[in-house]
Amino acid sequence: MRRIVRSKARCAPVFGVVVVLGVAATAVAQQPAITPQVAIDQARIHDYPLRKILESGGDFHTTPFTPEDGHGEGQEGPRARQRQALYPEAFPNFPFLRVNGLDSQSCYECHNTIGSYVPPDYSTKALLRKPSPVGGSAGLASNAFINPNFPWQLTYLVRNPPHVFGTGYGQSVAGEMSTELALQREIITRAAIAQAKVEHRPVTLSTPLRAKGLPFGTYSTRCTEEGQCTPDTSKVTGVASDLIVRPFQWKGIASSVRHFVRDALDFHFSMQAVEKVGHIDCDRDGKIDEMTLGNVTALTAFVAMTRPPYVVVPPDPAGKERFERGKAIFEGTAKDLDGKLAGTMCATCHVPSLPLEVPELVVEDPGVADVTSMDGCPSETLLINPEPPEHHATTQQVKQRVAAILAHKDASALNAGSVNAADIGAAVKSLLVSVPVPTLDAGDLRINLTHPGDAPAYVYPRLPAPTDRAPVNVPLLSDLRTHNMGSGLQDVGVQGADVTGIDIAPPLFLTRPLWGVADTGPWLHDGRARTLKEAILFHSSPGSEANPVVDAFKQLSDADQQAVVAFLLAQRLPIAIDIRQGK
């Protein structure tokens, strides 16, 4: 029951029934998650206070969706054959599947823990789950199974739910990185065409790619004097061939919070968004318009504005010393271990922080999908559904931002013909501030990440910055690149991303941001690691890029290994400001 009205009289639970002493109990009808009081109209998105939007998003995140909302599929729904195979006697009255989505009624069921702590009123060191857990991770029992081939194939992809704290920062940092990469692609393409026109022959040019100072391999293009170009991304590393940095999910398959939210609603609950299926009943449950544009905006904003993780350095001298020692080893700066560490060690990929030049989150308004019949319905059996590049919001944002930057009055250095990544990186830093993420639609919602204003407690605290327009260092502990993790961790097959034709190979995984990692066990993409030390050791297998680092870790003394773990244990998920438990 979503909410129960109780008197001030003492209540006692008896076998699941609430007995109200001294007064008669008043029955309250069960309500759906989406009511007129919380529904958001996208056409009026700029009329609502941000607090209202976020509070409604929290409702959609935590309150179980019901059949009245549109939860579940009909008897002839996309996963009907799978449900019938798994539950032959209960079908069609059993609405869940579990082995390929249809596994829950709310986001909260799989994002519900932010670790343990000692409550302030405890007299011992006994631990209790932290309050304010919305947006956290979950245990192995909440793993998601993605298997469109069930029952003909028993398992395919298994995913442990990650926490979603600070995702707005991640989206914005990745957007700036994508813009920087796309700028280099556009500049070298223009240079190749210009040279081909001068020489009257096809010209091939190459350039090393960098974003936020990090390497992304080499991009090449062959252009004719007529402007016909053939790109070569065979030597590009850490990012897909479209050069879009995707900061979300274990494989790096989603570039915006919204795209993943709309597909997760469909995959896990069969709550279909109009931006995906239009006004068509694609899941055949007799309901249309299950998730409106405004309601998806609210849920997206709620998730993206979760407060960022933080670092809790032990207050005692011994604990602080252990933390600092672990940090030095993690970053490869421990002087007494010169020659024994592998370069910058863990920080080679788990980069301590990335700069965000413009601390602004854009929640895009994609409009209603142009689906006019059942034949146009997208697949519901995939965790993420791709869009063609021309309909993909992030791709279009990057494209327009690059064009605006190159047209800016201060872009002379970028238009000088240099394809040097360092020159481009230096010039683009200030231009990112001058040319913010473009507005693709009047309904796009913009939120300042540093000072969002009046917002629910779960949003705070934010990352520090002197002003609401100043750059922010985002301590993700990630380079937001994909890496080969070897045969030991690789998936059994590819996983598609959010753009048509982009597939992530089985051994490739996104460098998982480690901020908050202490409170997100079990660890790794499928939850196989029961401890942080296990997670480190499981990075090693044939073909893994992490092998040299893991080998160096294995050679450390037990005390130094525990120091690295202590550093990771300081990366915490915070209890929201003004939320307390105990006295």
List the model feature ranges, each with a label.
Residues 1-9:
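N-terminal secretory signal peptides that target proteins for export/translocation
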Residues 13-24:
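Bacterial N-terminal signal peptides
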Residues 29-583:
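Periplasmic c-type cytochrome electron-transfer domains
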